[in-house]
């Protein structure tokens, strides 16, 4: 079953502002939340709204989605996903705190598995490397589970203990006086930071965090045809997960150096070829550089400057495997700045012959001279 357009899911136009996107999400998330909605397919709609907001609320994800659709958002050319949290501290608890007064929403289990954070790595390629693809070994700083304590944070030979202040629940009850009477709210236990567990003896390597900072070498395959600004997702190569959760993803953002001769427009390559007046007037066969090697191009007699020739299949491969682009050669006449006396005489002779030309151009030229 094909996915619905994210703008359609939120009931917005493609030009919607961030504020409009946020308001639409809050309204629909409240409407379809399983704890509130009685609709039969509320869970599916809630997940659909969540997914749409996660993409459209992020500038980078939204740009990729607008350009590539769902393929860009979900198949390696999208933005940063998978963490479960939304930017700016806005999540499900915010919805319920605004509607139900602070503690009424479902609270996330602090000990539940959570996916690790995504990472971003910038790489710069030469023009040809982007065309043909490349395999890179990159070194990135990551937080991995501590080998000494196996990620527990506790000193080897010891274990975490149940927090005595919250009895392992990770939450404590707090009474609050309001105009409506006394209300009991549940909030995260400050002693165990909401985990329900405490470390009596911390691991000396990670100091109780369960993680250590290290540099990790990762092999990245750059696909042929990738363009400037596109990114590659390497699944599971981000930060380590929490409480046994999966690792985040690594996003490699590609920058491509400009080329002195070639320019790129999508899968097509554009270049300008300088030719002499004689070559364009009389016709010639010239060698044209391409990223695939030199090819011969026939220039017909009488070719005008600015004429464009197409070299089929000599462009960049489509990054998704949808065929091959072409190369377009734009010819430009080069006017010599230094001439010998003989060359000048020949040009004067040619100019004199042009005066006697009975072609339309010649007639027009004489008409403007009043002849």
Swiss-Prot record:
<dbReference type="InterPro" id="IPR001305">
    <property type="entry name" value="HSP_DnaJ_Cys-rich_dom"/>
</dbReference>
<feature type="binding site">
    <location>
        <position position="189"/>
    </location>
    <ligand>
        <name>Zn(2+) 2</name>
    </ligand>
</feature>
<keyword id="KW-0963">Cytoplasm</keyword>
<dbReference type="InterPro" id="IPR008971">
    <property type="entry name" value="HSP40/DnaJ_pept-bd"/>
</dbReference>
<feature type="binding site">
    <location>
        <position position="203"/>
    </location>
    <ligand>
        <name>Zn(2+) 1</name>
    </ligand>
</feature>
<keyword id="KW-0235">DNA replication</keyword>
<dbReference type="GO" id="GO:0005524">
    <property type="term" value="F:ATP binding"/>
</dbReference>
<keyword id="KW-0677">Repeat</keyword>
<comment type="subunit">
    <text>Homodimer.</text>
</comment>
<dbReference type="InterPro" id="IPR001623">
    <property type="entry name" value="DnaJ_domain"/>
</dbReference>
<protein>
    <recommendedName>
        <fullName>Chaperone protein DnaJ</fullName>
    </recommendedName>
</protein>
<dbReference type="InterPro" id="IPR036869">
    <property type="entry name" value="J_dom_sf"/>
</dbReference>
<dbReference type="GO" id="GO:0005737">
    <property type="term" value="C:cytoplasm"/>
</dbReference>
<feature type="binding site">
    <location>
        <position position="149"/>
    </location>
    <ligand>
        <name>Zn(2+) 1</name>
    </ligand>
</feature>
<dbReference type="Pfam" id="PF00226">
    <property type="entry name" value="DnaJ"/>
</dbReference>
<keyword id="KW-0346">Stress response</keyword>
<dbReference type="InterPro" id="IPR002939">
    <property type="entry name" value="DnaJ_C"/>
</dbReference>
<keyword id="KW-0862">Zinc</keyword>
<feature type="binding site">
    <location>
        <position position="206"/>
    </location>
    <ligand>
        <name>Zn(2+) 1</name>
    </ligand>
</feature>
<dbReference type="GO" id="GO:0051082">
    <property type="term" value="F:unfolded protein binding"/>
</dbReference>
<dbReference type="Pfam" id="PF00684">
    <property type="entry name" value="DnaJ_CXXCXGXG"/>
</dbReference>
<feature type="repeat" description="CXXCXGXG motif">
    <location>
        <begin position="163"/>
        <end position="170"/>
    </location>
</feature>
<keyword id="KW-0863">Zinc-finger</keyword>
<feature type="repeat" description="CXXCXGXG motif">
    <location>
        <begin position="146"/>
        <end position="153"/>
    </location>
</feature>
<dbReference type="GO" id="GO:0008270">
    <property type="term" value="F:zinc ion binding"/>
</dbReference>
<keyword id="KW-0479">Metal-binding</keyword>
<feature type="zinc finger region" description="CR-type">
    <location>
        <begin position="133"/>
        <end position="215"/>
    </location>
</feature>
<dbReference type="GO" id="GO:0051085">
    <property type="term" value="P:chaperone cofactor-dependent protein refolding"/>
</dbReference>
<dbReference type="InterPro" id="IPR018253">
    <property type="entry name" value="DnaJ_domain_CS"/>
</dbReference>
<feature type="binding site">
    <location>
        <position position="146"/>
    </location>
    <ligand>
        <name>Zn(2+) 1</name>
    </ligand>
</feature>
<comment type="function">
    <text>Participates actively in the response to hyperosmotic and heat shock by preventing the aggregation of stress-denatured proteins and by disaggregating proteins, also in an autonomous, DnaK-independent fashion. Unfolded proteins bind initially to DnaJ; upon interaction with the DnaJ-bound protein, DnaK hydrolyzes its bound ATP, resulting in the formation of a stable complex. GrpE releases ADP from DnaK; ATP binding to DnaK triggers the release of the substrate protein, thus completing the reaction cycle.</text>
</comment>
<feature type="domain" description="J">
    <location>
        <begin position="5"/>
        <end position="69"/>
    </location>
</feature>
<comment type="similarity">
    <text>Belongs to the DnaJ family.</text>
</comment>
<feature type="repeat" description="CXXCXGXG motif">
    <location>
        <begin position="189"/>
        <end position="196"/>
    </location>
</feature>
<feature type="binding site">
    <location>
        <position position="192"/>
    </location>
    <ligand>
        <name>Zn(2+) 2</name>
    </ligand>
</feature>
<dbReference type="GO" id="GO:0042026">
    <property type="term" value="P:protein refolding"/>
</dbReference>
<dbReference type="Pfam" id="PF01556">
    <property type="entry name" value="DnaJ_C"/>
</dbReference>
<dbReference type="GO" id="GO:0009408">
    <property type="term" value="P:response to heat"/>
</dbReference>
<dbReference type="GO" id="GO:0031072">
    <property type="term" value="F:heat shock protein binding"/>
</dbReference>
<feature type="binding site">
    <location>
        <position position="163"/>
    </location>
    <ligand>
        <name>Zn(2+) 2</name>
    </ligand>
</feature>
<feature type="repeat" description="CXXCXGXG motif">
    <location>
        <begin position="203"/>
        <end position="210"/>
    </location>
</feature>
<dbReference type="GO" id="GO:0006260">
    <property type="term" value="P:DNA replication"/>
</dbReference>
